[in-house]
UniProtKB/Swiss-Prot annotation:
Alphabetically ordered keywords of this record: ATP-binding, DNA damage, DNA repair, DNA-directed DNA polymerase, Nucleotide-binding, Nucleotidyltransferase, Nucleus, Transferase
UniProt-listed GO biological process terms: base-excision repair, gap-filling; cellular response to ionizing radiation; DNA-templated DNA replication; double-strand break repair via alternative nonhomologous end joining
Protein name: DNA polymerase theta
Family: Belongs to the DNA polymerase type-A family.
Phenotype when the gene is knocked out: RNAi-mediated knockdown results in defective DNA damage-induced checkpoint activation as indicated by an increased number of apoptotic corpses and enlarged nuclei in the mitotic zone of the germline in response to DNA interstrand cross-linking agents such as nitrogen mustard.
Pfam families: DEAD, DNA_pol_A, Helicase_C, HTH_61, POLQ_helical
SMART domains xref list: DEXDc, HELICc, POLAc
Known catalytic reactions: DNA(n) + a 2'-deoxyribonucleoside 5'-triphosphate = DNA(n+1) + diphosphate
Listed GO MF terms: ATP binding; DNA binding; DNA-directed DNA polymerase activity
Helicase C-terminal domain span: 283-434
GO CC terms, sorted: nucleus
Function description: DNA polymerase that promotes microhomology-mediated end-joining (MMEJ), an alternative non-homologous end-joining (NHEJ) machinery triggered in response to double-strand breaks in DNA. MMEJ is an error-prone repair pathway that produces deletions of sequences from the strand being repaired and promotes genomic rearrangements, such as telomere fusions. Required to prevent extensive loss of sequences near G-quadruplex (G4) DNA sites, which are prone to cause genome alterations, by generating deletions.
UniProt-annotated location(s): Nucleus
Amino acid sequence: MDEASCRFPEWVSSKIIDYYAEQNIKALFDWQIDVLNEARQFEDQHLIFSAPTSAGKSIVAELLSWKVASTGRKVLFVLPYISVAREKLHQIQRCWRRDDISVCGFIGPQASNPNEWLGAVCTIEKAASLTNRALSEDWFEEIGMIVVDEMHMVFDSSRGAHIEHMLSKVLLWNQSALEKVRIIGMSATIPELYRIGKWLDGAKVFEARFRPIVLQNHIVIGSELRKSGDNKVLREFSEDPLILLTEESFRRNSQTLVMISSKLDAEKTALNIASRFHEINKTDSSLLEILKERANGLLFIKHGLERNGCKDRNVMSTLAWGVAYHHAGLTMEERECIELGFREKNIVILVATSTLASGVNLPAERVLIKAQPRGPSALTSLNYRQMVGRAGRTGHATRGETYLLIKKCDRDAVLKIIETPIDQGVLTRKRDAERTNLSRFILEGICTGLTTTRSQIHDLCKLLLFNSENLQLSDIAIEMLLRNSFISQDENDDQLSPTQLGRAAIASSLPPEASLAIFEDLNSASRAIALDTELHMLYLVTPINVSVWQECDWHHLFSIFSKLPSDHKRIAKLVGVSEKFILDQLQGRRNDKLLQIHIRFFSALALFDLISEMSIYEVSHKYRIPRGCLQTLQSQSATYAAMIVAFCLRLGWTYLKALLDGFATRLLFGVRSELSELVAIEGIDGQRARILHERGVTCLSHLSACDSSKLAHFLTLAVPYSSSNSNDGLGEWLFGEPRMRVDVAARTLKERARKVLIRRVQELGISVELPKFEENEENIQESCDSGLPDSCEGMEDELEEKENIVKMEEMTKSVTEMSLTDNTISFKSEDDLFKKEIKVEEDEVFIKKEIDEDEEEIVEETVIECLETSLLKLKASTDEVFLRRLSQTFSPIGRSRSILNNSLLEDSFDRPVPRSSIPILNFITPKRESPTPYFEDSFDRPIPGSLPISSSRRKSVLTNIANLDSSRRESINSNASDNNSFDVFVTPPTKSAKEEKRRIAVKHPRVGNIIYSPLTSSPVIKHPKLEINHFYLKDVCHDHNAWNLWTKSSTSTSSCSIRVSDDYTGIAIRTDAGNTFIPLLETFGGEPSPASKYFESFSKCIIPLNTRLEFLKTLAVTVEMYISSMEDAFLIFEKFGIKIFRLKVVRIAAYLNNVIDVEQEENSNFLPILMDRYSILDPEIRKTCSSSLHKAAVEVYSLKPIFEKMCCSGASLQLEMESCQTVLNIFYSGIVFDQALCNSFIYKIRKQIENLEENIWRLAYGKFNIHSSNEVANVLFYRLGLIYPETSGCKPKLRHLPTNKLILEQMNTQHPIVGKILEYRQIQHTLTQCLMPLAKFIGRIHCWFEMCTSTGRILTSVPNLQNVPKRISSDGMSARQLFIANSENLLIGADYKQLELRVLAHLSNDSNLVNLITSDRDLFEELSIQWNFPRDAVKQLCYGLIYGMGAKSLSELTRMSIEDAEKMLKAFFAMFPGVRSYINETKEKVCKEEPISTIIGRRTIIKASGIGEERARIERVAVNYTIQGSASEIFKTAIVDIESKIKEFGAQIVLTIHDEVLVECPEIHVAAASESIENCMQNALSHLLRVPMRVSMKTGRSWADLK
């Protein structure tokens, strides 16, 4: 290297320098340093620089752009070709992500939100479109730099206009912008370099001559070899110089590129070279020796081509000799295989068309150029320099040689071309209409708002590079745009504005002239479109000017046309295709006007076969189109389809847009429409989509409105059972995504569908913004009070207005047909037990509340009340809840479901339990005509949806209810304060005199079954009670006297309740001194809500924040504290530093009493449900809540009463409350976390991931998205042709084959890439799901815990430490090394040995199993010897049994045959018959709906609903409940005892994971503390157990070092 190298500038980040060092770039050249220094010195100027190929231009632009991106401004990289853009995207992403700078690609159909990236890599057209978008959407000022690679493309006759127009708009923007956009342009061959610099506002121009490897250029004229620029003949060839030069290259093992002008010539040349090598091999075996070195690589390439369906004999025959050809006639997959083979140096000679020189980065030591001075691909000066630049690239070759082969007759013409300066070559080249036609450029300027007058347009045109050519044409272009209604002009002034057609043209990236043709095409089609097949719609999205048919074989096309079905021929006639024209073509008669229509139709036929999932090779053979050209047609049509859809959308052609929407994706991927909408949602593959489709979830609206529990159930049907799912509650429920809970997966899918759905609806102009409910809360109240029809009037108008735009039925799954003429409203319950007809006036649509309250009916009152409550809750709900409740609130009249039975009441009442155990309390309503509503003897039949007293409460039951006379009815209200509570679900009484007169009547009493308490074994019967509410919220922080009085009174209280407000501004608290709200902000300006009879108006807080906090901290230590859930306790500590030491958790109590189901999404906000159930507060109070302050106060009021109503004495409740306090103390303690080591791990893992990526791509013969399961499946099963496991349970013919861990582990021996993908996924998962979330923690991690789980086990949640891996990679890194003890302390790890198995032994009382466990021998080892199976397989069986594993699952997990797995199962149950008996007994209880219980008596009833797999799953849940539940009770007892015993040693529990406890203890007390911990764990509930517990004790400095 003849130029000294220098280190990087000091302003470059060390992370970026490290990246380049890994790429073997450890220093910069002098010229690069000079450019960087000048660029930094003149930051306000644009920069244009030129340097030879391989001199290092890209790194200069990358460093400058990185500097801009690091300041938060966006950078655009503009590259000419998709292949080089993809390569640049991956490289920039790998580099910049080290500095946490996001980079995305605008290359294919994908797009990205501008808020999600700082760097964008674009093709030329995408960059032009992106800048238009930025200007239109007013975020252009966020762009700081535009880097144009291959700047010479600005002179290109077809695409250069895009660059010129884009940069001209930037120049105009910069004239008035405060923060300018900087332009960086570079290329090895920039014509008129200084002219470009002058054009770009006097940009700094830099031209370097340095090239690391000096080229040796040669010219071969005829058979004579000369050095370029020298007439001396160096050598004369006796045969074809090209063949001899390639043979010479092959013998010296030197890779060679041969550049040919045409595809046909490239194939012919490659075949000639291969034939030559074959002939030589007959007499000289030296070539064969060279090939032997590459035999494996060439064989691998051959297999790769075959797996991609390549049947081209020419490709295979040339490949056998290390020769290949590369042109656009090959498919993309074939080209990628060949490119990879050349990069890996397995292919020695590559013959390619000249487009490869600029489109693909494939350097070589020697480049041969076969000159063609004439024809469509004639050699140019610029093209020549691009091709010779491929020789001698740094890092790929040690020398560079070029040979230009010229026929003697073409000598003068070719020499003239290569000796012509590129500047002159550009100036003499003819420019096409795209360059001179300014209509598109001017229209873009007007649509983006850059120009609004003719003078501004002239100013913009002056900024063009070729302004002298264009200025005179600008007025002509403006007139054309005006004439064709693309723009309009104000009559009073010169203002120009875009029309709808103009905006549509720009939005769809269509030139104005093309827009007119497309407008006419679509307009005529919309009047007569055939919908019996997709062919006509596909024809409309097929490009008008199709150029993939090189030469049409009309004989063959006529044969195809004559065999078309009748519906296709009808469409052909509709679009203008005729048999007569084809016959005319056969006879040589031309008609150019109709030619394009016919070519377009046959192209549509080919595309129709492609989206019907016919292979590209079959379609290519059927229509005789080169497969590469067919792929080009497919890609162009996908792009064109997206443009057409955007065009229709902008024009407001909603129906046509709806018909054509989706074709872009289908054309791109070649799929049928059946599942396209569901598969478009991330996380859904073909298997999941088919299950959802079969269950009625056929579109996004169904998915978003589907009940979460149902959706979770569907996922369990779609995903094969795995034993790991039951251990921690996690599974691979979403395709290609990390393991998660099934309910989380269901909610995730709903959320994704909801977002897409709402975005689509909003795009149609229909507002679904929730704040409107919040802003008009009073109006909602009033409309609910006066009747719902008034509140819906506006909505009906809006729907009527939008009738011609969109169908709302599919969006909401609710707004369906409404009959406004029926004068009868019919209510039906689900089981159709009761019916009630209520007469209403003809103009009424919904149930109304009568003005005369004396004649109100309880059913109306209840419904209206529920509607009001639902609407009030609606304003604070998510959009998802909005969609669901909109559907349920405005249900159509006359449906088969009752309003009382739909989900309006789901927010107020628990999920019903089996009807067999539910006593029903029926509300009876007098006829509307009755003048005596309270004492009428004649009553209608009970209304449906009678409100049940749920047996899930397990507390009270209603027995022998007889008809009550008026006095008895009055006594119910008068006894509302009686201590003998009698729970009746009626509307709570209010202070209104009229409301006091209301009565209830009960008819046809039913006697309910006696229900046993979950905490005791005796039946519980209580009397109903209506609690009188005394609620008032007062402000004690506005005055010192009020504060002192309240604190003094509260200090003497024995208990209190607290609740964090939703906006975290403070805490609502209830003590004996009353209800109040304590703001915990430094400044609190008061609550603007007006005072009412329930809420005092809050004014500015004058009590110091420290005073407020100190009192609350003191109170939390001294009194018993009732809280809603553990999350509240965690929040109170994190937000305000308040610790609670005497805990009562309402959610735990509700769960123990089976009032809520922890698996149900609806129970996440359970307090309103419980408040309604136990009549804690008048709903009127909750309805008047106008802020989060009020809501918190209302909820805190209910905590203690709810807890006391639910709780009976019992060991289970006591244990849960004690363990909750212990877990809370663990949260307070936290565990020490080594953040520095974590960051070090992240850095190392990212390097490993990059290396793995390169290895995987190399093994796959091309790059692909490793994160995409679809692309992984495509590579494994199609590109590489691996065999899908037969035991996977999935049909190999499905489009999207699963590639989960289980499948890949079964395929691991087929190919090395499988193991690499598994390793990549494991490391990537550790990085993204473990290390990166943990990296933000400093000091100690205070982990949240989930106590309310279906099995009772304790789970970690925020952050989730449940699955911190023991080992990250093979070099010994472990994530558990990050969790350490403080200095002078050690960690003690105590882990139960076979806890679940020991519990099973106790519960089953199987003597053999009890004896084995009691003997303290290695159970698994002994069983392994007895059964002659591996120990690991035996262990899997024993634990799998607990989780309900069958023979098939066991065989998949242990990789044994199903027969062997069945033998193991039979051997296990034969040896331990008591286990089988216990499992059968538990299943029998489920069938009889009898309670099942844990060791200390926690009971529940699980109903065996469903058949087949669903029933088996429920039975497994029941068995799991008893075993896991009992295990959790042992573990909770142990940690409670441990906490009390280790205090004397100064030790504390810092973490619990599964059955393991981590204790941090001073090193001097480790031995004593370990002994105490072991005793506590071994003796936990030992008096109830038949088998002993055994514990593994370990100590160490970190979690990973425990020994």
